Each structure stands twice: as structure tokens, then as C-alpha cells.
């Protein structure tokens, strides 16, 4: 064979190799020989035509997290404490699937942390000091975070914080002797049963590790109490053991719902946040749980997955460790790391960190900061939902939201503080800090005069929306259309649209234009922010003027952008008389007839915050309004309800004042049952449910 032929043959083989699809592989990290044996069994029994499983053994969870972060492994299933740790630097991992402890039809992604004792003992919860204790592992949810947090909260355990001593040292003084796999304090490893280097290791190489191990520690009389989950004690042993309740009573094992330390999030599968293997891991596990024994093993209990799991459920793509665990549990873990000094009085908060959603909002907020004397500080976010997350994580304190986003905020745990009020013909409510009067506005459908579009013939029409999830621009019109058509696929009903927040490749983004002038640092077509020129009320109206056939906005939108009110090039020559409203009965009406021709009367925008910050935020905002509101003493210096360089910045420009919402008002009460129910129904259409809402409502621990 001559050289040329051999070269040609080699090149052909190389091309063939390159053309062949690369084999997909999921590398599972295991922490002991027993887990490795189970993993190898799964390799042999879980056959997937496209994805193969392999096993990577590491001595403990921390090294598994490192291996995944460094791309030497892909996944591991861990408890909430390790979900928290894995979500932090340097790991930056995220949960992608959760264990389900319910059934295939009635899912349950939570479990109960409990304290188990022998019936023959007599001590109460408040008498735990100087008892011998058995724990699942250091930093684990049921076995450490929950019980230690509760002991600190009840002031049974004294700890001056990490500046004085480690939490482990304080706990080692509290209990007489313990087995806490993974601990460094000798007294916390004294009762462990591992041999040589495996003694007290945070893996199944330590016999007393995890739930079954902690219970065995109690069974072997190495401890007086075991901190585990509700399903740890086999039914055959229920007659010999009972639960220790925080109220100093005892109850049978079966009464765990009435006697527990906390209800906590399920174990979850972690992988890298950059999503390079997420789809493969989910696809493999979804098929494997049908064909293989993922949740049991001949080699021991709770190996790789908990035996009590019945399935694995994919998490919403926007889920992260904080959202999965919830603010209360995440903050509780943080408190265990930072400590709370006895008799310490928290420093008084003196400033509200306001979340801004665009460069124009940030500019206005910066001006506000300058003249507020330090009462206002500004944070930056890309969208309303990002602001909600900032507040949940403690990175911001407040933001003003539309009713649709308020619904999401409420489902995520935020509360309404101050509501916008718009009626300039009746300013009586503005004379009081709080009023029984609630601000409202009207959701309307706007069309150009002379066109043939009506509410009755919207099929195939080009539509313009403020953003997905917003009240007037999405929830009301799409909810009404969905109810009328009995079809969740709104995109298939109308023609092309601009609905910021939709998939940029979908019909719902076809009319969007991003930022045509490229004035902003980041121009993202169809982004639910000022990065998209057709975002918001004025943006949806501009979309109608330039591309669409109907715009869904509020009743004042036409007036705010016509007859010389908006100097922007696209709006400066528009006349309000050139537009009409589409009425639900199929007729049309002048834009001035919004009270009789509208899609719905809807709740005002409002300022939201965390429940524990409600009073503080209200005090600051009320004070700022007295200075810079429409009747403020220093309104000539700064106006809270006017915008330069944009529309409706921080607050709607039509706001006359902010009214304090009565304390303990829930988000549902503020929004009203009718609107709340409408949004709840709309969100049953998976195509319309936001990623953040899906994350916040995934489980109820």
C-alpha cells in the first residue's frame, strides 16, 4: 500500500471517528466500599443505550464535592446540610433532582428530623445536657444542623460564637460523649465504632455514620439519644423506642408529625452549576429508577440514596441550593457558622437597600441615595425575579413589584409593605399614613383606531405584552384567553408576540427588538427588563405602534405616551385619539372609557420585603415620602414618583402616594382572592409558570 493511500485511509478513519457521537457518561461519586459495591451493581444492571454509569470512590462527602467541582466526578446525592455546603464557594454546585418519600401520585420532598430515645429512659428534651448522643454526621441536617440549632435557640447550649471557640467544642462540653462522624473534637468521636483511620469518618466506613448508623449507636448502648429521621427506626423496634419532643413530652415513633425537631427538605442530587451534565444525569436517573434498584441494596441501608425514597424528581432549572433549602433553613445553617452571642442586641438597621432592575433605575436610585442621607442604598439586578431572590438571600431589602411578581414574591415568603395609590381626583387617602383604601388600576387591551381587531377575534393577532408574569400585560389577558379557549398553549393561539421573559427562540419573542440603540451595557432581546425596548407598559405600547396589533397594558398607558407627554422619537407625534380599547364583549371604546371597557380591575403595585424587615422598611419609606413624595418638604430636590431617562422607574409615574399596608396582611389578602385565584389557575399551565415560582413552590418544608 503506497503512502498516499495509507494517508487517505487514515484521514478517512479519523473523519469517521470524529463523526461518531461521543459516549455520554455519568460519573457517580461514592464514599465507602459498600456504596462502591452498590454502584458497581448499578453499572451492570442499569443499561442505558446512550448514557453509561461509572463509579468514583472518595473517602468522604467533602472530597466528592471537590471532585465534582473539578470535573473528576459528576454527581452525588446528599442531605440538606451538604446541599448548603456544596452551593457555596469553592464548589458552586446546584441541586437538580430531589428524593421523593411520598408516592408516584402524591409526592413528598420533605422529611422530619427527630430525636429517638429508649422507652426505658426517662429524661426530657430540656435534660439533654450530659447525655450520650448519636448523630448522623457533622453538618448533616437531622443529625447536626437542626438539633444544634434548636439547642442554641432554646438556650440549652451556650456558645459565644466562632471568635471565642468552635461550635464543636461547645457541643463537646454539652454532651457527655458522642459519635458525630466527621467531627474533630475527641469527645464527639469517643462513641464511634470505626477501626483505625475509619473511626469517626464521615462515610459508611464508620459503622455509626448516617441514619442507620446513628440508630445502631443507640441500639448498642453507645448513646442515650439518636438524632435521625422519622423513618429510621424499623417498625419491629417501635415498641422499644419513642420520640423526644421539644415540649418535654415523649410520643410513639408513629406520632412524628406531632413530635419532631423540624420538617426539612429532601436529599438532593448535586452537580456543577454550569449544567454541562445536568440533562444526562436526569435522563439516566429517570430511566434507571424504572429499571434498577436505586433505593435498596444488599450491602447496607441508605447507600447512594435513602431507602425511604420511592423516586427522584427533577427540580426546576432555576433552582439553586438556597431556594431548595428555603430561607429559614439556609439562614439557620449560616447562624450555626457565625454564632449568636448571648444577650447580644442586633444593631439597628438604618438604611433600606433598594433593588433596581435597569441602568435607568440605578441612576435614579443613586440620585435618591445621595440626597437621602444614607437612608437608601441601591443594589442591581437584571429583573424583578432577580430582585426577589436578592431580598430572600439578604442582599437587598425592598423593591416595588407589579401584582404578578407580587404573587411570586408571596409564594417565596415576602410580604407587602406599602401600596401605590393612583387616583389624582381623590387624594384624601394620601393624607394618612395608612388607609383602608387600596390603590387599583385597570388592565386594558389597546388597538389602533381603524383596525378590525377585537377581543373576539384575537386568533393569529400580533400581541404586545409588558412581560410574562406581569398583571396587566400577561396574567389578566392570557388568563382570560386560556379560560375561554381551554388551551394552555397561548403561543399557538395568537400570532407573533413580544412577551419579555419568554424563550427568545419562541413566537412569543418574535416581535421583540432588544435595545436598538445599544445604549445599555447588556442588550438582551426579550429580556424582562429595560434591556428590551418593548418591556413594561410604555414598551408594550411602543410595540403596538411599531409592530403589533394589540397591546396589553394599564389604563393610563396611552395618556402617558401620547399628546406630547412622551418626547421619545417613537412617541412624540402620537395622538391619544388614534387608539381605542378592546372590550371583553367584542366591542370597542375610546381610551377614556377604561372604567367600563377593561379586562379587570387589579391591585396596585406595592413595595415588598421579608416579614422580619417589614416595620423597618415601612418606617424608612414613610419618612422618605414625607420628604420626596408629591407633597414632600423637599420635593424640589428629588421626586420619588417622577422618572428621567425612562418610564415608571422604581415606582409608577402615576403614583400619587404610598399607603402603608396593615401589618400581618398576607400577599393573598392584598392581591384579593379573585386575582390570587386567577393567577393560581394560570400557573397550572406549565408553559406560563415562572422558574422562580416553580422553585419557591416545589415543596413546603
Swiss-Prot record:
Subcellular locations according to the entry: Secreted
Disulfide bonds: 29-64, 39-55, 134-217, 179-192, 245-259, 355-387, 365-378, 412-696, 430-657, 464-543, 488-685, 498-512, 509-526, 583-597
Keyword Secreted assigned: yes
Keywords: Disulfide bond, Ion transport, Iron, Iron transport, Metal-binding, Repeat, Secreted, Signal, Transport
One function term, GO molecular function aspect: metal ion binding
Residue ranges, annotated region (Connecting region): 338-348
Known tissue expression: Plasma.
Start and end residues of each Transferrin-like domain: 26-338, 352-684
Keyword Cell cycle: no
An annotated GO BP: antibacterial humoral response
Binding site for Fe(3+) 1: 79, 111, 211, 267
Positions that bind Fe(3+) 2: 402, 441, 537, 605
Family matches, as Pfam families: Transferrin
Record: residues binding hydrogencarbonate 1: 136, 140, 142-143
InterPro entries, alphabetized: Transferrin, Transferrin-like_dom, Transferrin_Fe_BS
Binding site for hydrogencarbonate 2: 466, 470, 472-473
Gene Ontology terms: cellular component: early endosome; extracellular space; plasma membrane; recycling endosome
UniProt family annotation: Belongs to the transferrin family.
Function per UniProt: Transferrins are iron binding transport proteins which can bind two Fe(3+) ions in association with the binding of an anion, usually bicarbonate. It is responsible for the transport of iron from sites of absorption and heme degradation to those of storage and utilization. Serum transferrin may also have a further role in stimulating cell proliferation.
Protein name, per record: Serotransferrin-B
Source organism: Xenopus laevis (African clawed frog)
